[in-house]
């Protein structure tokens, strides 16, 4: 079985920065640290409202990321234009609503095949590999094939949010069947959304999975595992100032 890749989403480094309108913490530095720690790629979502990652972030990250850059974006002319200019290695096309806290579901590719085909084609023409963020649904998988996308990313939110063991097992089975179906259609299969240190392994064990994109859980864990060192460093500086 091939190695499973990890794409680290660093959006919430930018969320923390923007909460105070400062220049830190820096997503560019976070990307470097993640890569040094073994991340196989860096994912950022340039939202239409620019609530976390900014255009400037995207441009600098494209120049500095040493692995692979995956740009998540809505299917709009503006975003496709930006992607065609910056040329990330990958683009993941996602649905987007201004009021949502995070992406709430998969793209309805089947309901807008012509629009998706046009976007996928424009991105592919400049050498960008395209993934479509969809629910674990055979109809959407068929539509992704029709649109010409080489990759899909299966939305794992329902699996992550399941409130009982039986619900989670049912969602896992749905994802597993979708992954097998998609791989049989020649698609590369990624997955993401809501994956944590407690629920990732059953998804990671699915043999068709090529890459998992995980962000919030990793950034949250980083706060916890790095908090002691950060407090110690600050205390050292304060003590040194009084010497």
Curated annotation (Swiss-Prot):
Its EC number is 2.6.99.2. Coiled coil: none annotated. 1-deoxy-D-xylulose 5-phosphate binds at residues 11-12, 47, 52, 102. Pathway: Cofactor biosynthesis; pyridoxine 5'-phosphate biosynthesis; pyridoxine 5'-phosphate from D-erythrose 4-phosphate: step 5/5. The keyword Transferase applies. GO terms for biological process: pyridoxine biosynthetic process. 3-amino-2-oxopropyl phosphate binds at residues 9, 20, 194, 215-216. It comes from the Bacteria. It holds the Pfam family PdxJ. It catalyses: 3-amino-2-oxopropyl phosphate + 1-deoxy-D-xylulose 5-phosphate = pyridoxine 5'-phosphate + phosphate + 2 H2O + H(+). GO terms for cellular component: cytosol. The record marks 153 as: Transition state stabilizer. GO terms for molecular function: pyridoxine 5'-phosphate synthase activity. It is found in: Cytoplasm. The active site is at 45 (proton acceptor), 72 (proton acceptor), 193 (proton donor). Belongs to the PNP synthase family. This is Pyridoxine 5'-phosphate synthase.
